[in-house]
Amino acid sequence: MNNMINIEVEKIIDPTPASDGAGVKLKRSIGVEPNYYDPFLMLDEFGSENKDDYIAGFPPHPHRGIETVTYMLAGSFEHKDSTGGQGKMTAGDVQWMKTGSGIIHSEMPAMNDGKLHGFQLWINMPASEKMSKPEYHYIDSDKMSTHKDKDKFIKVIAGKFKNSEGPIKKHNVDPIYFDVELNESKTFNHQVPSTHNSFIYLIKGEIEIGNNKHESVKDSPLILLSKGE
């Protein structure tokens, strides 16, 4: 335990307003600057209560050699792809897609109005897997492992926290993907392998990381972390 290194804030990135698909408005925090944060290629937050910001969706488009991870917090999207994979995502659901040698898919709102909110993360695939067969994994919120105590509630999408293990396993980068809700003035600790690049996306509130408190961290910033354990 004495050899453990505290993880500290390396950089704070304010998301850039952008649009994608057929005009869906979003905030992009990875994929704007030229710096490559291996293996992460892009991170978008999409969210609005105005249907005009999302109703046109993401019509059929191709991907190759990457993984896309979509996590819904509110609203619903319907996915269809060229492998025959399809599913309707609602709040709390996750879609993890390995595009491999290539796939064409669409993501369209399955709602006419109301609040839509979620995230999409792109992960680079290693050269040895870029021509692999595409895979589509739909993970229902009810099947997600969770951890709850008096201080926090954690949804484990990938990786392991205490006795809760995420459904994404046997992955080339051993991903850790948690949705963490902390009660006020409480603490979250987790060991991250020193080989991992890691980040926090603060959806709401204020957090203290390592030995430094960042009073100005608000409005959905991306917080890149130093390597440690």
State where each predicted segment sits.
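Hydrophobic alpha-helical membrane-insertion signals
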Residues: 2-27
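A short glycine-rich, His/Asp/Glu-containing loop-to-beta-strand
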Residues: 19-73, 144-189
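Extended, compositionally biased flexible segments
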Residues: 46-113
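Short, conserved beta-strand element in jelly-roll/cupin
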Residues: 62-77, 122-126, 177-183, 195-209
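Short acidic-glycine-tyrosine-enriched beta hairpin
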Residues: 80-98, 187, 192-193, 198-201, ...
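Generic beta-strand structural signal
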Residues: 87, 93, 105, 117-119, ...
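Ligand-binding loop in jelly-roll beta-barrel domains
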Residues: 100-129, 214-216, 226-229
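Long amphipathic alpha-helical segments that form oligomerization/scaffold cores
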Residues: 125-154
